[in-house]
Amino acid sequence: MSGQAKPTFYLLRGDDTTRIKEIIVGFQAGLGDPSMADLNTTRHDGEALSFETLQADALTMPFLADRRLIIVENARAFLTKMAKDRTQTCLDLFENLPETTALVMVVEDQQAKKRGERYWEHGKAYAWLTDWMREHNDR
């Protein structure tokens, strides 16, 4: 790994699915050899993902590589089904992700405008995460 720590948590939010896919392809390319990148990339659908599965994957060491990539598509479903008493446990995981893990949450959402103010249409459903991100923008 290089001297500077790489971020371990990414939130890709919006409705530009083409751009989101391009960013994810870039993350995968950053893993190096494509065959090793495939071995070190895990994709989940947030609708079916449990916290325990995410935690196990996030803490697994990469195989013959510096990093592993975990992509959670439809992450809004995962984030909104998180019981209030589990959100802190989830944030603790995000806060303590090993440098060998890059966790990417993909949240399809749209910006809307009300009284001249822009906001995310579904932002309240996962505000606990975006609040944490504002406080921990170094992760």
Show the residue positions of the predicted features.
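Conserved beta/loop motifs at nucleotide-recognition and modification sites
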Residues: M1-R139
